[in-house]
């Protein structure tokens, strides 16, 4: 999972006006679920939120906000973080279905760019521990939710990746709320999907190999310093900087590998401000032939 500053994007006024028009229509049928679902299911309604997908991709350099993968995690969907028609809570061992957050159907701040695998599994799952919002007048910000949210700066930090490519809760105490939320998120989004886990493992091995190479180069430099050796070290550090840049697929895996190495230079590298404009200048977000949204 990667942090996405959703406030960096604002749709056109035309799009916002259309959203308000659709919301007003939903509110006019607030007591008629069948009619609301009919409005949401209309082709024109779905095209409306689908139209933002390319803009959402730009916020993450074309990576799924949950998995940080591109093609590994299938075609992209525009996920409604809070499900629109119905919501499911199965945390008690029993599946409980309630009305969804229909008033957020056309609110772009409820959209998350998701790979199809995770979003297909997530569907209507959205467990709330306390203060569940049930109507437009309720404040969703007061909800104590199970899902970690990529638009919340501290939520991605509640997940870690190990050398096997496995994603796990960073909080190891099973009864702690952060652990419970992380475990729920991993399971409901299948963030340890086999191909995804394998790709993370490959990334880790590559990064670890580069760490060892820098160790070797540094040892040679310390024993017999030269400008050329120093340049080779800096070039290799620049290669690693590219691995942790926001345009790099699964960059969180590379960051985890550097952190696990405990090398002083690696930890210092993680604290650096990434020169995104320079490193990601050649990155182009590919257009998809298949457009999916939920």
Task: Give the predicted meaning of each segment.
Residues 63-69:
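Local cysteine-cluster metal-coordination motifs and their immediate loop/turn environment
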Residues 1-51, 72, 277-294:
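A boundary/linker detector
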Residues 55-57, 68, 103-106, 147-152, ...:
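A general structural signal for short secondary-structure junctions and capping/turn motifs
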